[in-house]
Regions:
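Basic, glycine/lysine-rich polyanion-binding surfaces/domains
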Residues: 1-206
Length: 206
């Protein structure tokens, strides 16, 4: 896989209602944070639409999206009509979000879902810690809560490092999402035992 030229953006949200505005959209709980947090924005069907970093500034919220695939500004503007806020969008330096950024993320065991095909991904498959199941309503909450409480999640998305060239001889129920350098991002059955992957498949979990 070659990392295509990303579309990294920053959006600043001003206004007295900025906290309440973003709280009603994101999966995480900004009321419990004072500096920064990661979160998802979902479709009504509970699929990942955006992965964002939110930085709490003195007079605004700074929203960072490493690869804006679906026009984050237009999405926020749709919900902003009933709130006392204003939005400003800035392009970020693409060089900071290229192959080196993506490779460093994989080495640290972090999957940036802005580089994956969003429309098929459940957020709990990737970074469940980006979801606060105790907070109030947000877009897609009903779906993700049902998956959580009824234990309907069937897949996990994990990062593995290849130790040999045979690592691509994968079982049929393994879905290869990304192959980049010496790393694979795989979608696996949730309860599969991967402790023997290194000896059997030449894969080491990151």
């Amino acid at each position: 896989m070659k990392i295509e030229t990303p579309n990294p953006i920053k959006i600043l949200i001003y206004g007295e209602e900025r906290i309440d505005f973003i709280q009603n959209i994101i999966t995480n709980d900004i009321l419990n944070e004072t500096k920064s947090l990661y979160s998802y924005i979902l479709t009504p069907q509970g699929k990942i639409l955006f992965e964002i970093q939110i930085n709490l500034m003195n007079d605004c919220l700074e929203i960072i999206c490493s690869n804006d695939q679906s026009d984050l500004l237009s999405y926020l503007e749709k919900y902003a009509k009933l709130s006392d806020i204003s939005l400003q969008k800035f392009q970020l330096d693409k060089a900071n979000f290229g192959e080196s950024y993506f490779l460093d993320s994989l080495k640290m065991g972090k999957i940036d879902t802005n580089f994956l095909p969003h429309s098929t991904l459940n957020p709990s498959e990737v970074h469940d810690e980006y979801i606060n199941y105790q907070k109030g309503c947000f877009v897609g909450q009903e779906v993700v809560s049902r998956i959580k409480h009824r234990q309907l999640q069937k897949k996990n998305i994990l990062i593995f490092e290849k130790n040999n060239q045979n690592a691509l001889n994968l079982p049929d129920d393994f879905e290869l999402l990304i192959e980049f350098k010496n790393f694979l991002v795989l979608r696996l059955p949730k309860n599969i035992e991967y402790l023997n992957f290194e000896s059997e498949l030449g894969l080491r979990k990151i």
